[in-house]
Amino acid sequence: MRLRIASWNIRGMPHPTDQLRLLDDQHADIVLLQDVGPSAVRAVADSRLWNHVMDTWLLPRPPGAIIRRGGCLIAATDDWVLLPVLPVQHVLLSSRSLAVTATHREAALTLLSCYAPTNAGPGRKERSGYFSALAAWLSTVSTPIVLGMDANGPRVDHPDIEQSRWWTEEEALVLGSGAQTEDVLRLWYANHPTELKRRVRYYPNGPLADSYHRGRKGKCLRCRYDSIRVSPGISVTDVRYLYEEAVRAGSDHALVMAELELA
């Protein structure tokens, strides 16, 4: 079964018409969004581009949960049935992540949309715990996983993952080698060495794609904070990072697209 996945930090969706048009143009079966507020949820639902929509604002929150401006949203076409699965007892995960079980005939997936704390302000104290908790939860999942994430990292997305640099060492539990899921862009590059060689020629220290520009104009640093990750065994046939298109539509993060082949 072939599946088209979109993952995007929509920055609250300040321009819903433009951002929804860009998403619609990609013909995604499943959409994983981050930094989603109630107005963005309404815009996605009212667009009727997807038949099923779930978001962190609808789910019960545990005591102590922080009500953030941005949550997460997962939407799917009519072929899929969505049921929430992320345990709400973990305060940090419940406020920054959304997980659902998605079924289509005999196929079943665990879908996650995750919005990691930044390495600045209050997020700096939360970041290590978030990645540790997420890695622990991922290790308990028995169904194949598709994860869309604004990880606000790594600090350096090196072509050799062993040379990537992290804001906190716990990031590697989710994003590094040996994690429960694999980066679809690195999987795609493994099967397209000529494309990897071309990228590394211009960016020998990374990033492997542009998804976010950190710093001030004129002195910005290209970063790849956004990614789609999958369980081993899920094949990747195409990956695209639509940075310029996403910025024109109203975000400051790339829209990440992946075409997957399920066994």
Predicted regions and their residues:
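Structured beta-strand-rich core segments of catalytic domains in phosphoester-bond hydrolases
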Residues: 30, 36-119
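Short, solvent-exposed loop/turn segments at secondary-structure junctions
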Residues: 11-13, 37-39, 80-81, 105, ...
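Metal-dependent phosphoesterases centered on the DNase I-like endonuclease/exonuclease/phosphatase
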Residues: 30, 44-46, 50-53, 128-232
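Surface-exposed cleft-lining segments at the edges of enzyme active sites
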Residues: 87-88, 114-131, 155-161
